[in-house]
Amino acid sequence: MKLNISYPANGTQKCIDIEDEHKLRVFYEKRMGQEVEGDTVGDEFKGYIFRITGGNDKQGFPMKQGVMHPTRVKLLLAKGHSCYRPRRTGERKRKSVRGCIVAQDLAVLALSVVKQGDSDIEGLTDTTTPKRLGPKRANNIRKFFGLTKEDDVRQFVVRREVVKGDKKYTKAPKIQRLVTPQTLQRKRALKAQKVKNAQQQRDAAAEYAQLLAQRLHERKAERAEIKKRRASSLKA
């Protein structure tokens, strides 16, 4: 069985192949999310504590959290479920997944380091892989660098170097939800336009109501005049 160990603190991961069944017994009958001591796995893992985050069997079927079964099962999955991505709106499909209990027929078991042990593991805890991209939203940039609302966020955007042929330049993401005098002016202009449109609609409605009342009054007067003429002709 292969152990795919990740170390989120450093952003690194390493895949280790273990053939001795006795070393793997500590993981059997354990569920996803449970923590396991790494002393029995090997001397280099002494003092380490791992959390089981997932795995898949030799046919590639992944483990699914919440399915209390050590073997493969078929479930009707929809949007929002793990181990399934719908291709159409409202689509559901019956898919084969493994339960969340670790069994012997797994090919790869995914682990995450919760507590570091006595010694470093080469390629896992002794190296650091920095994040390729920094935060993009204005509030997240402020939180990341500990800035106040008065500080200019645009000076602190994480830029990355790009090499294209002989040219070397830097790229920065577009800051989302950035409040600038220009955006505030646009907001005020939009609000003023809405108020203006509403006033125009009210004026048009009042003008139409006035015209309608005038037409009704004219029609009423016209009918009264016709009645008057008929009455006078009958008398004559």
UniProtKB/Swiss-Prot annotation:
It comes from Debaryomyces hansenii (strain ATCC 36239 / CBS 767 / BCRC 21394 / JCM 1990 / NBRC 0083 / IGC 2968). Gene3D superfamilies: 1.20.5.2650. This is Small ribosomal subunit protein eS6. It holds the Pfam family Ribosomal_S6e. One of its GO terms (molecular function) is structural constituent of ribosome. The lineage of its organism: Eukaryota, Fungi, Dikarya, Ascomycota, Saccharomycotina. GO terms for cellular component: ribonucleoprotein complex; ribosome. Belongs to the eukaryotic ribosomal protein eS6 family. Keywords: Phosphoprotein, Ribonucleoprotein, Ribosomal protein. The modification Phosphoserine is found at S232, S233. One of its GO terms (biological process) is translation. Phosphorylated. InterPro entries: Ribosomal_eS6, Ribosomal_eS6-like, Ribosomal_eS6_CS.
